[in-house]
Structure formats: structure tokens, C-alpha cells
Amino acid sequence: MKKTIIVTMLILLAVTSAAFAKNKAVTLPTSDIQVYFSPNGGCTEAIISAISKAKSEILVQAYSFTSAPIAKALVDAHKRGVHVEVVLDKSQRKEKYTSATFLANMKIPTYIDSAHAIAHNKIIIIDKKTVITGSFNFSKAAEDKNAENLLVIQSEELAEIYSKNFMAHKSHSEGLAPKY
């Protein structure tokens, strides 16, 4: 497993410069990994597309979550019967445009991770086989203004590792109650 991850990372490094020049998604021939860059590189669209295909479970960890389109996609998945859970950094409890309250109000289990100086994760795990991660915060600024990156990785092994990490953070987080 460790060797597979190292080889995958080396391949990613080899194609990063080409992907950056095109600012488009790149599917690597030896792995099912897509690479996106922002600004305006389709990161939000890739996330929404993956969420829309979810069948059973979506686990989200986020530092900054103000993206209305991503929040809406999670709510739509929840309404389709997909189990959705979200763990957010403590800053999202008071952030002006946070999606935290919206998600909690829509009956999506939402938790605040206050155990760390910053819970700086940007992770979505879908159906125990897809991992979305990178520097990309789930925000409009990340899509339109910031230089960010996003990986969409198809790997049950990696999804299991990230799911265990999600559960560890959820276990020390506080549930966010709906406001209405």
C-alpha cells in the first residue's frame, strides 16, 4: 500500500506542470486520480459532480465551508437518502457566511472540532471509495480568487484511511444543534 501511494505521488508530480498549464482536470493513465487547480479550474464543479453520484455515504471535514453550491449538493444528497455527516473547524461556529448552520438546519449531522488550534482538513469521502482532498477550501474565494489544488482519488484503501481519521475527529467534536 505504501509503495502504491509513493508511486501515485511520483506520477502526480510528473503531470502537475502539464495540468497547471492547461488548468483542466487530468486523469492519470495508471491511476484513477483527477487533478484540478483554481482559480476557475472547476474544483467546485468536480466536487458537486462527485456528490451528485453518491449512493450511500458522504463524510466531510472542512476548515472553511462557505460554498452555497457545495452545501446545496450535500443537502440534495441527504434528501436522496445518502447519509451525510460534516465535521468543521471551530471558526465555522461564528463565521458570517458559514454553511454550518444551514447544514444543521437541514438535519445533516454537523459537528464542530474544537480540539485543535485549527482543524485545517479539506476532505470529502464518498461511498467508501472516493476521496476528495487538497488545499481547496469549500468557498467561493477558493474557486474564483485563490491559487488552490484539488485531487479526486478513487481508492477504497485510501477512503478507509480517511474514514478512520474522520471518525477520530468526529469522536472529539461537539454536535451543532439546528437553529430552527
Language-model features, listed with the residues they occupy:
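Boundary at the C-terminal end of the N-terminal hydrophobic targeting segment
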Residues: A19-N23
